[in-house]
A protein has these predicted regions:
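Interdomain motor-coupling "hinge/lid" segment immediately C-terminal to the ATP-binding subdomain
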Residues: 127-179
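Structural recognition of the conserved hydrophobic beta-strand(s) that form the central parallel beta-sheet
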Residues: 91, 115-121, 142, 151
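Pre-Walker A adenine-sensing motif
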Residues: 1-17
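Conserved lysine of the Walker
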Residues: 32
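Hydrophobic positions on the alpha1 helix immediately C-terminal to the Walker A/P-loop
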Residues: 35, 39
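Sensor-1/coupling segment of RecA-like P-loop NTPase cores
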Residues: 110-131
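Short glycine-rich substrate-engagement loop in P-loop NTPases that contacts/grips substrate
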Residues: 54-86
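Hydrophobic anchor at the beta1->P-loop junction of P-loop NTPases
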Residues: 24
Length: 179
């Protein structure tokens, strides 16, 4: 996997223990899903993922939940993973397809103490259709395409070469042609 600066932001969110869910937005194809899945695999025993576009039946299933316990059971069935606070990352992908789910995150992350990450490429536009945005219960993060440094690292440019590039930029010198 590519080393992304956003990974460190995910780690900071996890370590802060604020009982806040994390909302990750960004353009399509910038690596949101891949990053979250890798983070979950690295730091949790289980990742319970529900993608509301790939699983259209999930929207109806979630909308019929009576309370938080019922919702957790439904999400567990949809993801095929037991959801346990402290051991499971609940990853709700393409949230723009299920407006009610954003409201539920308040209860999942706050009262139930679950680590919840919600993501979607069009979420920033569609979030305004939600009845009750959980103010104070969601930390937000915007993800961007690779920056230049991440790109160079992905191309396996050695650290001394990256340092040389940085020095050339700071000193406004020409970059050596071998770089």
């Amino acid at each position: 996997m590519l080393k992304r600066h956003a990974y460190d932001q995910l780690l900071n969110w996890k370590n802060r223990k604020t009982k806040q869910g994390l909302l990750i937005t960004g353009a399509r194809q910038v690596g949101k899903t891949t990053l979250i899945e890798q983070f979950g695999a690295d730091h949790y025993e289980h990742v319970a993922k529900v993608n509301f576009i790939e699983m259209p039946q999930a929207v109806e299933t979630v909308s019929k939940a009576k309370d938080t316990e019922d919702l957790i059971l439904r999400l567990s069935v949809l993801s095929g993973t037991e959801i346990t606070p402290g051991k499971t990352l609940l990853f709700l992908d393409e949230m723009q397809a299920c407006e009610d789910m954003l409201t539920w995150t308040k209860f999942l992350s706050g009262a139930k103490g679950l680590d919840v990450i919600v993501s979607g490429s069009l979420l920033g536009i569609d979030v305004f259709n939600v009845r009750s945005i959980p103010v104070g219960f969601l930390q937000t993060m915007r993800m961007y395409p690779l920056n230049f440094y991440e790109f160079c690292a992905a191309c396996r440019l050695p650290q001394p070469a990256l340092d040389t590039l940085r020095e050339c930029y700071v000193d406004r010198r020409e970059v050596p042609d071998y770089l």
